[in-house]
Swiss-Prot record:
Catalytic activity annotation: malonyl-[ACP] + dodecanoyl-CoA + H(+) = 3-oxotetradecanoyl-[ACP] + CO2 + CoA; hexanoyl-CoA + malonyl-[ACP] + H(+) = 3-oxooctanoyl-[ACP] + CO2 + CoA; octanoyl-CoA + malonyl-[ACP] + H(+) = 3-oxodecanoyl-[ACP] + CO2 + CoA; decanoyl-CoA + malonyl-[ACP] + H(+) = 3-oxododecanoyl-[ACP] + CO2 + CoA
Pfam family for this entry, one: ACP_syn_III
This protein's UniProt keywords: Acetylation, Acyltransferase, Cytoplasm, Fatty acid biosynthesis, Fatty acid metabolism, Lipid biosynthesis, Lipid metabolism, Multifunctional enzyme, Phosphoprotein, Transferase
Lineage of origin: Bacteria, Bacillati, Actinomycetota, Actinomycetes, Mycobacteriales
Subcellular locations according to the entry: Cytoplasm
Domain remarks: The last Arg residue of the ACP-binding site is essential for the weak association between ACP/AcpP and FabH.
Organism the protein comes from: Mycobacterium tuberculosis (strain ATCC 25618 / H37Rv)
Family to which the UniProt record says this protein belongs: Belongs to the thiolase-like superfamily. FabH family.
Annotated protein name in UniProt: Mycobacterial beta-ketoacyl-[acyl-carrier-protein] synthase III
Gene Ontology cellular-component terms listed: cytoplasm
Pathway, per record: Lipid metabolism; fatty acid biosynthesis; Lipid metabolism; mycolic acid biosynthesis
Biological-process GO terms, alphabetical: fatty acid biosynthetic process; fatty acid elongation; lipid biosynthetic process; long-chain fatty-acyl-CoA metabolic process
Keyword check for Glycosyltransferase: no
Residue numbers of Phosphothreonine PTMs: 45
């Protein structure tokens, strides 16, 4: 029997850099409350959100991803010619086809490289990061861009008091490649499809096209169900990720959970028994929930402010629509 040849690549893979793009428009809680019976204090107390960013009409998930990738490449001291592939993780690339990744690669000037989109709700960044690391270790690529990008603002029903204050827009990218020491641990991922309706688009686009004068599609959220699932299940996911990476909770310097709700993340910190001085990302306060972009955006913010530094040992946990989750231990990159 003829054997099929295989390839292998770098054994030690890590994050070389991160780059963030935040839209200019800042939307306050007071502006959100013009459409609902609520207040800045009520929203902040329950979510930890004070402001968020909304993209301009001429901005898209792909255009924001491109800018984030440019900044990540610059921070790594690389050019588009040094990249072998792009993975875009998003829930808001509003074209069924073509995928966003080849468009982003072309905009960067990276011709002929591999590119694909990955959709796993708010856990998408963890899935994409794991895929990139495995591709590099398998020899399919040497250096890759992974970018989380979302334009969620058009999907929000601004009169839905249950979630109109949560979601926001933005993008952040990391460069993944060979490092002197292991910089990305195994990905622990899974899903609970029995709770798929907990975060959902309520009307599909085909149904809407058949009745364009009817209700339009929006994202709907069953907040209490998601809160319970995340607060009480994701602690175990984090422990499994640490076990897989061979590290203890007291060795974690930085905790970067999905920026869905600061109250959920406060419970996770207690559940995980991290060190009292461990840095906990709280980018949600001025960024909102940017779904697949939230973890890399939060990483960028920690590095920009100096709250974390390159090389710090970080636990990442993404969770959301699906319901899906993905977690891994990484070394923080350059900002």
């Amino acid at each position: 029997m003829t054997e099929i040849a295989t390839t292998s690549g770098a054994r030690s893979v890590g994050l070389l850099s991160v780059g963030a793009y935040r839209p200019e428009r800042v939307v306050t809680n007071d502006e959100i409350c013009q459409h609902i019976d609520s207040s800045d204090e009520w929203i902040y107390t329950r979510t930890g959100i004070k402001t968020r960013r909304f993209a301009a009409d001429d901005e898209s998930a792909a255009s924001m991803a491109t800018e984030a990738c440019r900044r990540a490449l610059s921070n790594a001291g690389l050019s588009a010619a040094d990249i072998d592939g792009v993975i875009v993780t998003t829930n808001t690339h509003f074209l069924q086809t073509p995928p966003a990744a080849p468009m982003v690669a072309a905009s960067l000037g990276a011709k002929g490289i591999l590119g694909f989109d990955l959709s796993a709700g708010c856990a998408g960044f963890g899935y994409a990061l794991g895929a990139a690391a495995d591709m590099i270790r398998g020899g399919g690529a040497a250096t890759m861009l992974v970018v989380g990008t979302e334009k969620l603002s058009p999907t929000i029903d601004m009169y839905d008091r249950g979630n109109c204050f949560i979601f926001a827009d933005g993008a952040a990218a990391v460069v993944v490649g060979e490092t002197p020491f292991q910089g990305i641990g195994p990905t622990v991922a899974g899903s609970d499809g029995e709770q798929a309706d907990a975060i959902r688009q309520d009307i599909d686009w085909i149904t809407f096209a058949q009745n364009p004068s009817g209700p339009r599609p929006f994202v709907r959220l069953e907040g209490p169900a998601v809160f319970r699932w995340a607060a009480f299940k994701m602690g175990d996911v984090g422990r499994r990720a640490m076990d897989a990476a061979g590290v203890r909770p007291d060795q974690i310097d930085v905790f970067v959970p999905h920026q869905a709700n600061s109250r959920i993340n406060e419970l996770l910190v207690k559940n995980l028994q991290l060190r009292p001085d461990a840095v906990v990302a709280n980018d949600i306060e001025h960024t909102g929930n940017t779904s697949a972009a939230s973890i890399p955006l939060a990483m960028a913010e920690l590095l920009t402010t100096g709250a974390a530094k390159p090389g710090d040992l970080a636990l990442l946990i993404g969770y959301g629509a699906g319901l899906s989750y993905a977690a891994q231990v990484v070394r923080m990159p350059k900002g």
